[in-house]
């Protein structure tokens, strides 16, 4: 028998989340963001459940090629663009849309021999200071690209660092409007948070990511609790051992937890080598036999320990939900000082994955 841990991907939830994102986007077209192997869910496993989208946005050429080979004919956007001039031959062959964020990429496009023009997303730095042209550089970069025979449809693209708040989009929007003055151009600005909460950012294309997988862009599940969004990934395991502690007994590496009285604890077949956060402290929520309880002691490579006080009937073989419909991944992440995005992406290869 295999170790009892398994991740389950709910394709119906994925389809529902896409429909909710579509409704939130109004009349805007929708890029479904499937970077990082579809946020750890497996791009080859989930893309068909997102087939009603208008396009896929990702990073890796390998994933773009996979989608084309699987029969996807609608647009694919490379969010970080191409990394070497030689990549343009691949973009041409597979008809990929690319972001452009640096002058060297404009030069490469000017010099490339392509069979047909490529659609381009000109990336503006709206204040996040990662990729993109500064606002005062946008017009010049736009005009250069517009003059190239290798450039087809040209779209202005930007990203919000703080779209969870109204203030977080107001100032970047001002910069974008100033930079785009006089340019007749489609725009793609909205990430998940902006798609849900800031319709003034929607424009021509929105780019939802984390909400497709049923977690909150703010990191707070309560912010999307009434939206209809559903967790797509559920991570479950079983109790594989039980210990009866006396008062003063310690648990796990570093003896970080000490029982204040007589207490039963369960040992769960899941650890940080499976992608569970190593820094999850005592008190992190977990569900055993349908009852909410908590992690106690340090997370080990292959095991965690949980308090069985709320579920005295639990024993060997009892079902454990680490995150999913009942234990929100955002709550586990928040307790552990991280975000749901990271936990999804950190799911280890050794964890079996099934779909339903």
Swiss-Prot record:
Query: Domain of life of the organism in this record?
Result: Bacteria
Give me any GO biological process, just one: D-alanine biosynthetic process
An example of a Gene Ontology cellular component annotation for this protein is: cytosol
- Record CDD domains: PLPDE_III_AR_proteobact
Against Gene3D superfamilies, the record matches this protein to:
Alanine racemase, Lyase, Ornithine Decarboxylase, Chain A, domain 1
The enzyme class is isomerase
A single GO molecular function term of this UniProt record:
pyridoxal phosphate binding
Could you tell me what reaction this enzyme catalyses?
A: L-alanine = D-alanine
Q: Which residues bind substrate?
A: 130, 301
* Cofactors named for this entry: pyridoxal 5'-phosphate
Instruction: State the coiled-coil residue ranges.
Output: none
Role noted for this protein: Catalyzes the interconversion of L-alanine and D-alanine. May also act on other amino acids.
Protein family according to the UniProt entry? Belongs to the alanine racemase family.
Name of protein: Alanine racemase
Gene (UniProt): alr
